[in-house]
Amino acid sequence: MGQTLFDKVWNRHVLYGKLGEPQLLYIDLHLIHEVTSPQAFEGLRLQNRKLRRPDLTFATLDHNVPTIDIFNIKDEIANKQITTLQKNAIDFGVHIFDMGSDEQGIVHMVGPETGLTQPGKTIVCGDSHTATHGAFGAIAFGIGTSEVEHVFATQTLWQTKPKNLKIDINGTLPTGVYAKDIILHLIKTYGVDFGTGYALEFTGETIKNLSMDGRMTICNMAIEGGAKYGIIQPDDITFEYVKGRPFADNFVKSVDKWRELYSDDDAIFDRVIELDVSTLEPQVTWGTNPEMGVNFSEPFPEISDINDQRAYDYMGLEPGQKAEDIDLGYVFLGSCTNARLSDLIEASHIVKGNKVHPNITAIVVPGSRTVKKEAEKLGLDTIFKNAGFEWREPGCSMCLGMNPDQVPEGVHCASTSNRNFEGRQGKGARTHLVSPAMAAAAAIHGKFVDVRKVVV
């Protein structure tokens, strides 16, 4: 019997254990940041343990960093977290992409950009959106702080192998419709728990035609569908992306092995979902989880349960309204879902020559220093600033209400991030998940519009 891509990578990393029971996996790459690592490092100190593989552990600063003045950290908690990671990196010999360095940025962007993320690896991070790296044909998943400490001490983790779910996506994406719309549509259609207990493998011609940026967007939000893992077969697009990256000096000797990473024709999946994107519309969420979304042309649904009622009450919306009726106040272009160069380029096409609507506060936060520098070389910062956007330093920013960048209470925000939970972007903030193009158009028009009619 053939094996799935996920099976192949998993089986190569099993050190001990039987199928159906917890198995001990070797971890190839451990990415850490300032929020979920301090307690784990302290655990090592208390037990007088060494960091098992400092050469496979890499740190960056992202969740709680300021995006206006990176060297004047006013928040005491943020300053403590940042300085603690800086000290831990020195004490334990960990390579850190520090504040102001050329590579610093959101952890799920730094890994791919530096070449640390590679096909066939097992990758963990104390962050729920670690599945992003699965776009390279890696098994990548988020872990808790106690597991972070376990990897620190042993470079292994006990995990139970999930079932395999194939999501076969075909058809040509219409103009103005993007990878973000694909994953939002899947979650809207099948729910926030359809992937629970599964590893999601995204396949099909649509996936093959996506850039690595688009593939990362889809895998990034696998967790929003309940899945711990999202994975895509590596191909020439993948290899070309990895080639020449600073930490990919093993490329020549590894690429032939990477070409063996695919699901066999006779591999058996536990479940298969098929999607034709030929008529897919731009997606907009109306509620308080990513499942609560609609096609742009559709009205918000009738109330079916208490969760819907609570969501409508929190969001200040009603059934039958449409996305264009939402009174927007903020637009956020950023996050590990959509703050890559291609996202900013797409948004800039819509913004160029226009002005941000007077009712809108709009900010752009490149996901990494690398993206920021590349965008500025292309003049994107000038385009956004001339239109009235704020152009910020890299970090997680307004994706989560942890750092200074927050949406005011009761204000609706068009956001390119991945979660629209209550309070996610700040106390009482009302988040609507959309593609970068939809967010950019909303900033200019002061409301959601059909981006298919304005994209160039």
Curated annotation (Swiss-Prot):
Catalytic reactions on record: (2R,3S)-3-isopropylmalate = (2S)-2-isopropylmalate
Protein name: 3-isopropylmalate dehydratase large subunit
Pfam families: Aconitase
Assembly, per entry: Heterodimer of LeuC and LeuD.
Enzyme class: lyase
Disulfide-linked positions: none
EC number: 4.2.1.33
Record organism: Staphylococcus aureus (strain MW2)
Free-text comment on the cofactor: Binds 1 [4Fe-4S] cluster per subunit.
Residues that hold [4Fe-4S] cluster according to the record: 336, 396, 399
Pathway: Amino-acid biosynthesis; L-leucine biosynthesis; L-leucine from 3-methyl-2-oxobutanoate: step 2/4
GO biological process, one term: L-leucine biosynthetic process
GO molecular function: 3-isopropylmalate dehydratase activity; 4 iron, 4 sulfur cluster binding; metal ion binding
Keyword terms of this UniProt record: 4Fe-4S, Amino-acid biosynthesis, Branched-chain amino acid biosynthesis, Iron, Iron-sulfur, Leucine biosynthesis, Lyase, Metal-binding
Family indicated by similarity: Belongs to the aconitase/IPM isomerase family. LeuC type 1 subfamily.
Cofactor(s) in the UniProt record: [4Fe-4S] cluster
Chain's role: Catalyzes the isomerization between 2-isopropylmalate and 3-isopropylmalate, via the formation of 2-isopropylmaleate.
